Amino acid sequence: MPSYSAVLSRPGVTRVMGSQLLARFAFGMMSLALILHVEQTFHSYTIAGIALGAETIGAAVSGPLLARQLAKVGPRRLISWLASTSSAALLFVAFFRGDWIWVIIACLVVGLTSPPIQQVARAVYPTLITKNQTSYLFSLDATLQELLWVFGPVLATMISATYSTTASVAFMAVVQVVGTEMFARNPEIAGLKFPPSKRRLGGVLRKPITISAVLINATLVASFGAADVGTVAVLGMQPAGIVIGTLSLGSLIGGFAFGHRAQSKWAMLKFVSITMVGFLMVFANPTDLVWITLSWFVVGLGVAPSFATMASMIAVSFGQADSAEAYGWINTAQLLGYSGGAAIAGIIIDNTFHAAAWYVTGAMGVAAVLSALFTAKFNPELPKREKNA
């Protein structure tokens, strides 16, 4: 993989990418750690679900708003302050034992003050590489993000089982502060100044590529939410974690194999269609553990390439300030999409049968493919790959 090596050898790339992953590692643990801790503290899955929902809503609302503040406050000051506030709220959740409503409020604060690490990193990436390396860098970034979702839940479970759920949530708080500070101290970030956007808040949504990204991400991630809930319902809690992990494994492989190959306007449609193949496969044997595992692996092959392609398209379509806001809207779409897909699948399961979740997964997958098809004309051509690829 000579071109991936060339990207990593560029000054600052490894430093920014590595510290970004550490700063965001808490997000990989967040869902499971909060559910385990709040349920154990208050003995109620309902309260645990509300707590996680509050955090998700907070993060969805704050994404684009915080991205707009990067030019006014400066990325280092903003993300450092946000990480400190969010981590303080996490520590409150970890150690508070009073009325549950205060934990819900604290979880909302956690979401509202989640530092926009990924938006900052993706906005600064294009300044660290040559134009022909764009697809490689965003493919590498999207692929490595899967590590958060592979190891985050595992670590949350291990710490909770070995020590306590309190220790798991407290660990997230510490990792977030330390990782964010390491990220913020990078010279590429510490001295970074975002030019003020000439657009009003939400102005980037007037550009068709942003609408395309929001639609595709919302529907695609909604299919993942439904798939996760369905997998747990059909197979049970214990095997579900491993089976869902194969989707991330497929995404890791797909990211390195295909993510950098995006060039044409139709690349996004091709990669989203790969996920649809996996979603259709599951109907052949909808309750078999091995077949579901294989199906989710195929789904994963298209995940990282899809996210990498979308990130690359945003990078070549906007300047730093506007790209950060655009990534914020995409993050909001993903959060709302996952929550919506999971909720719809849960309702369908409760009122019909467990494997009915696959119909929700398939429907959302079809919506993602159609979104990619009808918005392909708005996609920019991506820079040609390096000749040694």
PLM-predicted stretches and their roles:
Residues 322-353:
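A late C-terminal transmembrane helix in Major Facilitator Superfamily
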Residues 34, 115-129, 305-318:
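Intracellular juxtamembrane helix-capping segments at the cytosolic ends
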Residues 77-91, 170-173, 267-281, 362:
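Structural signature of the two symmetry-related core transmembrane helices
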Residues 161-174, 347-366:
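A membrane-interface helix-boundary motif in multi-pass transporters
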Residues 267-310:
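C-terminal transmembrane helical hairpin of 12-TM major facilitator-type secondary transporters
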Residues 2-58, 204-247:
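Helix-loop boundary and gating motifs at the non-cytosolic
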Residues 61-75, 160, 253-267, 349:
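Helix-to-loop junctions at the C-terminal end of transmembrane segments
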Residues 108-147:
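Cytoplasmic helix-loop-helix junction between adjacent transmembrane helices
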